[in-house]
């Protein structure tokens, strides 16, 4: 049985780590490299960096910090932000990232998923999906440009359909960002994860809602996700990653210690 992954998420804007609630009102958390180092030392299995305004600003992720992070950590890390071509992805991978993640650019050009998977291998290609539960329609809808409040918008895709589409096109992993839960710290959306898991045959990472150690255990036990991503509970030192792994081990969840 593969060990479940614990993945701190670092949202980056203007060279600093920030965190919002439900993708709004971002506050500065601190500098990128020291935080990355801290999480690697605490026992994180992987890190994810989102340059949150790159897509909405029409630019690619700022690569200067990618190289600095690669120099100081020895765990895999994934970078996202405005990657619109194989050339963009190649540069980020050359600077030391292990994976690239695409979100809004994949919605604008789904062929990009296939192009990247063909060039770099599916194991390098993550698709991030920002999913919002619309209480009026009772449906999960995919959103794009979520790094910028003014430009965030719904797409034509329902979450389940987009999950199936990106797999057909070569996504090697999916990160499901559950917008209603983001930063609220009241637990992952178990129903949504199970709905997506039922049609997802690649590794699935839960994102949005972690507030306590039991939320991680619940996600792993009730939905069979491969990893859980969290931000504010780690940034604010509410949860220590080493202690979280010991707790999960006691709950019979397979983790790397």
Swiss-Prot record:
CDD domains: HisF. It catalyses: 5-[(5-phospho-1-deoxy-D-ribulos-1-ylimino)methylamino]-1-(5-phospho-beta-D-ribosyl)imidazole-4-carboxamide + L-glutamine = D-erythro-1-(imidazol-4-yl)glycerol 3-phosphate + 5-amino-1-(5-phospho-beta-D-ribosyl)imidazole-4-carboxamide + L-glutamate + H(+). This is Imidazole glycerol phosphate synthase subunit HisF. Its main location: cytoplasm. It is an enzyme of class 4 (lyase). PANTHER family: IMIDAZOLE GLYCEROL PHOSPHATE SYNTHASE HISHF (PTHR21235:SF2), IMIDAZOLE GLYCEROL PHOSPHATE SYNTHASE SUBUNIT HISF/H IGP SYNTHASE SUBUNIT HISF/H (PTHR21235). Keywords: Amino-acid biosynthesis, Cytoplasm, Histidine biosynthesis, Lyase. It is found in: Cytoplasm. Belongs to the HisA/HisF family. Pathway: Amino-acid biosynthesis; L-histidine biosynthesis; L-histidine from 5-phospho-alpha-D-ribose 1-diphosphate: step 5/9. Heterodimer of HisH and HisF. InterPro entries: Aldolase_TIM, His_biosynth, HisF, IGPS_HisA/HisF, RibuloseP-bd_barrel. The active site is at 11, 130. It comes from Vibrio atlanticus (strain LGP32).
């Amino acid at each position: 049985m593969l060990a479940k992954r614990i993945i701190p998420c670092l949202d980056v804007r203007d060279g600093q780590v920030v965190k919002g609630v439900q993708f709004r009102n971002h506050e500065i958390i601190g500098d990128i490299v020291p935080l990355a180092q801290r999480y690697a030392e605490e026992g994180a299995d992987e890190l994810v960096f989102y340059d949150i305004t790159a897509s909405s600003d029409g630019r690619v992720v700022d690569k200067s910090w990618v190289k600095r992070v690669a120099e100081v950590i020895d765990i895999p890390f994934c970078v996202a932000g405005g990657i619109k071509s194989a050339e963009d992805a190649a540069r980020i991978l050359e600077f030391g990232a292990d994976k690239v993640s695409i979100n809004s650019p994949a919605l604008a050009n789904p062929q990009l998923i296939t192009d990247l998977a063909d060039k770099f291998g599916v194991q390098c290609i993550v698709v991030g999906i920002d999913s919002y539960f619309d209480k009026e329609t009772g449906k999960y809808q995919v959103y794009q440009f979520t790094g910028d409040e003014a430009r965030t918008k719904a797409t034509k895709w329902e979450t389940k359909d987009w999950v199936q589409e990106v797999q057909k096109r070569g996504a090697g992993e999916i990160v499901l960002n559950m917008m209603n839960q983001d930063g609220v710290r009241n637990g992952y959306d178990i129903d949504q994860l199970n709905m997506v898991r039922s049609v997802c045959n690649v590794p699935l990472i839960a994102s949005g809602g972690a507030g306590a150690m039991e939320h991680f255990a619940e996600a792993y036990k009730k939905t069979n996700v491969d990893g859980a991503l969290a931000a504010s509970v780690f940034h604010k030192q509410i949860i220590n990653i080493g202690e979280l792994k010991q707790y999960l081990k006691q709950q019979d969840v397979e983790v790397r210690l």
